[in-house]
C-alpha cells in the first residue's frame, strides 16, 4: 500500500492502524530552528481525542504524543528546537477492542472501505478499519501542529457550521465560542439544537454528517502557482484525503454559480495604509491558484459514519447476501472531531507552499 505521504518540501508520512500497537508520522523538510513544546502538539491532539463527550465515540485513548527524532531538548527540559532532520512522532493505541469486529471479518460494511480495500489488495484489516479508520488522522493533527509554526504568524481555525439538516446562523458567529462547546461551533445558540439532534441519532442507532469551515489568517500573498500547483488545488486535495469527506469548496464555492459576475468579483481599492484593499472575499483568499493575502476560507462535507447499529443489506466475502450490524464504539457524527483534522490539513498545505514559494522567489 503506497501513497502514505503528502507534500513537496514539507512532507508528511503517516503510519499505523486503528487497532495496531501505535500510529504516528514522520515529517521531512521541516526547517531547522522551529521552537515548540510537546504540550503545544498535545493541545491539538486533545481537541481531536475520542471519548471526551457523549457526542463522540467512547473509545478511551489518551493520545499522548512522543517525540522520537528531529529536535533537540533545550535547557528547560520542555522546549525543543528542530534540527532540520526528519521529525518522528508516535502515538500509542491503548484501548483497542478488536473482538467487537469479529463478525464483520467476513462481511462488507455498506459505505465503508471494506469492499474496495479487499478488491484492490486482496486483504483488509477489519479491526476498526485499519488505515481507513479516522484514528489515522491523529497523526495528521500532530504534523499540523508543527506546520502552523512554519508560516510566520499563521492562524488556522475551524468550526462546525452544520450537523445534518441544522445550520448555524452566521450573524451569531463568535470564534470565542468554538472551544466552549463539544461541537466546536461558533454559534452558541445551536449547541442545544445539535445536542438534542445527536442524542436522537444515537438513540436511533444511526449516524449523521456535518459541514466544517476552516479559516486561515495572516497568509502572505503569493503562495501557490498557476495551473498544476494551485494553492486551492492542494488544500482541496488534502481535505478530500480526510476519512469520510465527500465534498470541498473554497470561498463561496458552489454558491458562486448562482451569482452574477459583478456580484462574485472581489473588487479592490487602495487602503489608507497604501496597501491594496479587497472589498469582499468571494474567492476565499485565492485567485488563480495564488494566495491574495486575504483570509483563506475552505469548507468540507463529512458523510455519516458508516459503522452503525441499524441493520443494512450487504454481502460477505463468499458472495452471500447478509444483513450487517456494526458493533463497537463509533462516532454518531464523525464530523465533530474532523475540525482539528481539517485545520491540520490546511496548515500543512500552507507550510508546504510557503517553503516552495521561499525557495523559488526568496
From Swiss-Prot:
Listed pathway(s): Metabolic intermediate biosynthesis; chorismate biosynthesis; chorismate from D-erythrose 4-phosphate and phosphoenolpyruvate: step 7/7
GO process annotations (BP): amino acid biosynthetic process; aromatic amino acid family biosynthetic process; chorismate biosynthetic process
Disulfide bridge positions per record: none
Keyword Amino-acid biosynthesis in record: yes
Pfam family, one: Chorismate_synt
Class of enzymatic activity (EC top level): lyase
Known EC number: 4.2.3.5
Stored PROSITE patterns: CHORISMATE_SYNTHASE_1, CHORISMATE_SYNTHASE_2, CHORISMATE_SYNTHASE_3
GO molecular function terms attached to this record: chorismate synthase activity; FMN binding
Chain sites annotated for binding FMN: 131-133, 243-244, 288, 303-307, 329
Record's cofactor remark: Reduced FMN (FMNH(2)).
Similarity comment text for this entry: Belongs to the chorismate synthase family.
Family annotation (PANTHER family): CHORISMATE SYNTHASE (PTHR21085:SF0)
Quaternary structure (record): Homotetramer.
Record protein name field: Chorismate synthase
